[in-house]
């Protein structure tokens, strides 16, 4: 359903001919394929070049004492530099030996992605290669489904640009790294697309997998519930469809149950947030704390942490108009999901750096990029270049920063 600035109260059923469906599918694959390879080539080239020219920060020995992200020797390690940094250490550790009861920090990292990495590792015999392959494949799927969903809601031109917008977003560096972002992106888009096209069993199953991938995954209940209430196909809403929605929290419940059966704390995923310095400050109070941190940072730009506060605030400012556009132009389910997902990091800020990880939270909020694609499609080539070129430059810079073991997000 094409939305031209007016928010409909209900969702219309999807009807298409087979020929039309085939054309749309082929366009989605072609556009996604191009965005995937160009963006990943940019990430790899920038990251490898930076690691080769400038080497690694001394932090590598502190945050990766076991050298799990650099097992190949100098040349090989440089080639995989953009793939395994920072949280990759945790995912690789979990893929190797799970969740020991004595290490509560690991419970902040949900199990589905490391489980897939461990499974792939039995074939490729390299945890880093396994993690990168899982992420790369998931990102490819995510781009195709994002194209399909955006075309459905906003039209083909918006879909074509939306996949480029998300692939070139600076936070997209993690979509091909040993991180769970690509898996969660694929599952969350697939979940919403399934519900949008009336496949409620698929929506519930993918939502449950999303809830086993990230702490925010359980919030996929929100868009599904709103979509169920907003159906307009002339039939009474089916209780069976709502029952599939109730499957979503099962992913989180399974994780908690597995921890308890292993002798650990069933509520460790919730308690782990305290270990990583997240605290409840009040609904969206993180916006104020992040603004204050950025203001202080402007007066102390010589400090890396201060500069990071300013950069993170810039991401927050850039996100606001996209959120407003989603609320105005997309069906209510998308806006509800975006607000619920942003409420987590912005209501539970990190003490030392309130907006920490915000670019990663934003990167997986696909409705934002759907609307960015629509806005760019409606404008001139100059508008598109003015947005996508700096975004690509930012992606290259972030790739260089992360690959040399300097912190981003």
Language-model regions, residue ranges each:
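Signature aromatic-anchored transmembrane alpha helix within multi-pass, membrane-resident enzymes
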Residues: 245-249, 378-407
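Membrane-lumen/periplasm interface segments of specific transmembrane helices
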Residues: 42-60, 83, 210, 221-322, ...
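Short hydrophobic/aromatic helix or loop-helix immediately within or flanking a transmembrane segment
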Residues: 82-125, 284-290
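Loop-to-helix entry region of an early transmembrane alpha helix in multi-pass inner-membrane enzymes
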Residues: 107-111, 115, 123-141, 304-313
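Transmembrane-helix motifs of polytopic, lipid-linked glycan transferases
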Residues: 119, 133-153, 318-325
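Specific aromatic-rich, kink-prone transmembrane helix
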Residues: 145, 165-168, 183-202, 221, ...
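Transmembrane-helix signature of polytopic, membrane-embedded enzymes
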Residues: 129-130, 146-168, 186, 332, ...
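Short acidic/glycine- and proline-prone juxtamembrane loop motifs at membrane-interface regions
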Residues: 177-183, 358
């Amino acid at each position: 359903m094409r939305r031209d600035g007016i928010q409909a109260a209900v969702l219309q059923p999807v009807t298409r001919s087979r020929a039309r469906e085939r054309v749309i599918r082929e366009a989605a694959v072609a556009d996604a394929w191009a965005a995937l390879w160009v963006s990943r080539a940019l990430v790899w080239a920038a990251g490898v070049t930076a690691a080769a020219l400038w080497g690694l920060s001394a932090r590598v020995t502190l945050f990766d004492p076991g050298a799990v992200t650099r097992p190949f020797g100098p040349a090989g390690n440089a080639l995989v530099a953009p793939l395994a940094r920072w949280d990759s250490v945790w995912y690789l550790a979990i893929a190797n030996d799970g969740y020991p009861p004595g290490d509560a920090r690991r419970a902040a990292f949900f199990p589905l992605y490391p489980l897939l990495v461990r499974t792939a590792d039995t074939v490729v015999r390299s945890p880093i290669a396994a993690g990168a392959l899982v992420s790369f494949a998931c990102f490819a799927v995510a781009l195709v489904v994002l194209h399909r969903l955006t075309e459905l809601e906003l039209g083909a031109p918006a879909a074509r640009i939306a996949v480029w917008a998300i692939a070139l977003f600076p936070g997209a560096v993690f979509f091909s790294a040993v991180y769970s972002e690509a898996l969660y992106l694929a599952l969350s888009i697939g979940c919403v697309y399934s519900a949008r096209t009336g496949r409620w069993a698929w929506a519930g199953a993918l939502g449950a997998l999303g809830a086993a991938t990230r702490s925010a995954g359980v919030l996929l209940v929100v868009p599904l519930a709103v979509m169920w209430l907003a159906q307009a196909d002339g039939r009474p809403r089916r209780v069976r469809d709502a029952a599939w929605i109730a499957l979503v929290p099962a992913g989180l419940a399974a994780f908690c149950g597995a921890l308890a059966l292993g002798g650990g704390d069933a509520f460790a995923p919730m308690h782990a947030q305290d270990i990583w310095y997240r605290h409840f400050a009040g609904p969206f109070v993180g916006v104020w704390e992040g603004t204050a941190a950025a203001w202080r940072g402007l007066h102390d730009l010589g400090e890396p942490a201060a500069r990071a506060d300013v950069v993170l605030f810039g991401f927050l400012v850039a996100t606001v108009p996209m959120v407003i556009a989603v609320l105005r132009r997309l069906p209510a389910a998308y806006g509800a999901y975006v607000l619920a997902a942003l409420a987590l990091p912005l209501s539970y800020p990190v003490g030392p750096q309130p907006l920490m990880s915000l670019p990663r939270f934003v990167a997986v909020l696909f409705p934002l990029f759907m609307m960015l694609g629509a806005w760019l499609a409606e404008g001139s080539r100059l508008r598109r270049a003015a947005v996508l070129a700096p975004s690509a430059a930012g992606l290259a810079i972030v790739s260089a920063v992360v690959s040399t073991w300097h912190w981003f997000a």
